[in-house]
């Protein structure tokens, strides 16, 4: 996540003591939210003096780069990005690396649904899987669908996961897999959108589609079916209450002192506009917009 070359010399005198360029990097789950808000913020104001009369007349540049939660934290730690985006809890070691100016901004709550293709005949047999069965499926210990339910065909179970740099991989490992490793035959996906699309295109697929990605995939037609986990459904109410346990925060962090311009954009993220974008992307807002 390196800063783009263009606009670096834009109003250089003003940039000596004013930050006109802001860079976010990391989680592909948070990426569409921040990217959408960066675009609307830039289109609305164009130059920083339109945001605040005390700011200089320099062009607004808010760059957002996907790369995964781990990449985002690293970029925030080494200073190649102002903010690292995560879709998991931040580790104590990462907080320590970010230093005394560490700050976290939680934008949304997300959960990992255990989703199968909506055409899978399993959906007619049961709407729930227990954690141990899920673990065995993802570990490859249960390899065909007839091992889940004897009435199903002996088709190979195709497992879909996020790539290893994604926050979801760590969340699922901690919440479900424990000491077990995900099967090496699992197909890795570069984003939650891709993961959901992969399951939707495979009648014998299963994967941990994020709540937001699941809702977006099913917006026009139900293509995914989320299994209850130990009888608990991944609903907004159950995620907020914590009853549905396979969940994660969606947030961004920094180790820098937040500049006035960055704070102005953060205020925009946590406004009604930001709230609406979070909802549009299928997530549960973790904030109440300022009046």
Where are the regions that the model predicts?
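Exported/periplasmic ABC-transporter solute-binding proteins
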Residues: 2-97, 102-291
